[in-house]
Amino acid sequence: MADTDDIIDYESDDLTEYEDDDEEEEDGESLETSDIDPKSSYKIVESASTHIEDAHSNLKHIGNHISALKRRYTRRISLFEIAGIIAESYNLLQRGRLPLVSEFSNETMKQNMLHVIIQEIEEGSCPIVIEKNGELLSVNDFDKDGLKFHLDYIIKIWKLQKRY
């Protein structure tokens, strides 16, 4: 039991030493030299709703910017997309769809199907619609320069293969 009394006395002596140190530190510092700024330096926000509205309008602006980028990107056609349009158009012509060209005649029916498909795409009368970024787009909705660039590339390949 004597040992436990010594432990209790030891603990109480330590606590009083720390309490004495805290009191000495508090007495030594004044408000002017402390790390805490006086109340007069704090800014009072009149309403937090202005910050919320600013953040909301900023989010709207960012959302509109992303939508505009998406629309601009949607108008660019990739080589895979044009190849898919050509393949689907070829498939439908094989199954009996009539060509939608401006000068439809018996000569059109005798032409190579690839010539007819390219003519439909160049005239903008190709009936194939693809979905891109949630929008249904026809050949007319895409950038004409990009479309022409990819068609020329595909035609060069076909000419090398002696298909066109």
Swiss-Prot record:
Q: Which InterPro entries match?
A: DNA-dir_RNA_Pol_19kDa_poxvir, RPB6/omega-like_sf
* Chemical reaction(s) catalysed: RNA(n) + a ribonucleoside 5'-triphosphate = RNA(n+1) + diphosphate
Location in or out of the cell = Virion
- Which cellular component, as a GO term, is one annotated location? virion component
Stretches for region Disordered: 1-39
EC number, as in UniProt: 2.7.7.6
A GO molecular-function term, please?
A: DNA-directed RNA polymerase activity
Pfam (any one): Pox_RNA_Pol_19
Chief localization:
virion
What the protein does?
Part of the DNA-dependent RNA polymerase which catalyzes the transcription of viral DNA into RNA using the four ribonucleoside triphosphates as substrates. Responsible for the transcription of early, intermediate and late genes. DNA-dependent RNA polymerase associates with the early transcription factor (ETF), itself composed of OPG118 and OPG133, thereby allowing the early genes transcription. Late transcription, and probably also intermediate transcription, require newly synthesized RNA polymerase.
The annotated subunit structure for this chain is: The DNA-dependent RNA polymerase used for intermediate and late genes expression consists of eight subunits Rpo30/OPG66, Rpo7/OPG90, Rpo22/OPG103, Rpo147/OPG105, Rpo18/OPG119, Rpo19/OPG131, Rpo132/OPG151 and Rpo35/OPG156. The same holoenzyme, with the addition of the transcription-specificity factor OPG109, is used for early gene expression.
Concerning its family, UniProt says: Belongs to the poxviridae DNA-directed RNA polymerase 19 kDa subunit family.
| Name the UniProt record assigns to this protein | DNA-directed RNA polymerase 19 kDa subunit
